[in-house]
Amino acid sequence: SMYPSTIMTLNISPETKLGKLIGWNAKEFIRGVTKTYTLEVDGREKGKYNQDELKEMFDNNQISVSSNGVMYRLDRKGLIPVLLEKWFNERVEYKALMKKHGDAGEDDKYGYFKRRQHVQKIILNSLYGVLGLPVFRFYDIDNAEATTLTGQDLIKFTETITNHYYNKELGDKKDYCIYTDTDSVFYPALPLVQKRYPDADVSNDEFMTEQILLVAKEVQDFINNGYNYFATKFLNVRGEHKFDIKQECVAKSAFWVTKKRYGQWIINDGGLTCDKLDVKGLDIVRSSFPPAMRDLMTQVLKDILGDVDKDEIDEKIMKFKKEMKTTDIQNISLPTGVKKLKKFKDVTPKDAVFTTMKKGTPVHVKAAWVYNDLLKYWGLNNFEQIKSSEKIKWIYLKPNTMNIKQIGFKGYDDPPKIMEFIKQNVDYDKLFTRALEKKIRMFYEALKWDMPVDKANTLAVSYTHLTLPTNGLG
């Protein structure tokens, strides 16, 4: 947990905050750039320091300095770091138990402690989150920014020194970093493994994983040694720091759609052999996505990661589109929650069948009202209406005698008459376009692919090459 580690390292807490250096830049300070720094305490100027004076103050006092220039005393631990350290140690214990039971093949206990350590991670990060929350008792925007900006500098530093390791090992000046996230970096292991084993069979997962873990351990140790320099030179923390990076997983392939939205085919997770899809930020796995479409897009992602030919993926998508008409409505309708139904109700004429909706009413709310109105209109009084805060499903309809564009339903205990009406009037083309095509396009554009087409219904035109006589047409 990078943010909690940053808070503990800098000793960020309301009672340890000393002031803020205006104009602070760690790299300039390390290089000895001549400049004057202004010290502010509670927004008031308390003094000015040149390069030498500031260095003397740092050398003679136990003071840390964050990337945004906030200084903290280090001679005693602050309240927030003490709490975080307790929770942090508990997470370390849970992770050790997770690994122990994982190595022993005890899947249930492994799963329990994996979830437990993840809960602990959320608790740790939540304390950072409230630092920037105005209603929090210890709210301080300087402390919140000190955490995030220092964390950003740490990841940039990690990227820089890891590239240095690769460049030294491989004898080049390339940037090998694939991707950086808030608290992680992604690097290809293949260049290092192939440098050491030129004839290695890269398709041998067992051999590659073994070598990758060895290489990752070397890189991991190199980075962690570099963190000693970062803590001392960038933050003026000369004693213990909490920065520690660890190899997390080995992915056979990965696919980035955009920043923070990607999928990985993982074959080793935390030192344990596996074969699973890991998805971050892609809404294809969200519960608000129709189950059948979720299954399709998950398979498409797996195919992309497995380097399946585009034509084969296209065929699966077009086959799904054709078979939508025979798919259970429950599996292709859009699941969602519906709230504050009455809020969107407008003045409705007495003889109107359907309730008038206010401008800007969300489509799923309109769909829920249509369902309730049909219950009344058709006298289906034995069935419960959709209520606020319920989970529903809804779907687009093609032009029909009732002039209904969309309709919701509960997904259980629904009147057969309404369900039959839905079945007869589903607008499959609109549903595919609105719910699925955008997701497909997002993947295909990232790969620079053309969108899939139905080849069976695409007009193919043959051309005959004609050569004109050289002496003209006359």
Task: Spell out what each predicted region is.
Residues 15, 92, 96, 129-132, ...:
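Non-catalytic alpha-helical coupling and interface elements of nucleotide-dependent molecular machines
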Residues 132-143:
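Gly-rich Lys/Arg/Thr-decorated short loops/hinges at beta-loop-alpha junctions or inter-strand turns
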Residues 183-187:
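A generic structural motif
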Residues 87-101, 120:
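Non-transmembrane amphipathic alpha-helical segments
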Residues 465-474:
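Single conserved hydrophobic/aromatic residue that forms the stacking wall/gate
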Residues 1-68, 75-76, 80-83, 102-112, ...:
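DNA-dependent DNA polymerase catalytic subunits
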Residues 122-130:
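Glycine-rich, acidic and aromatic/proline-enriched surface loops and short helix-turn segments
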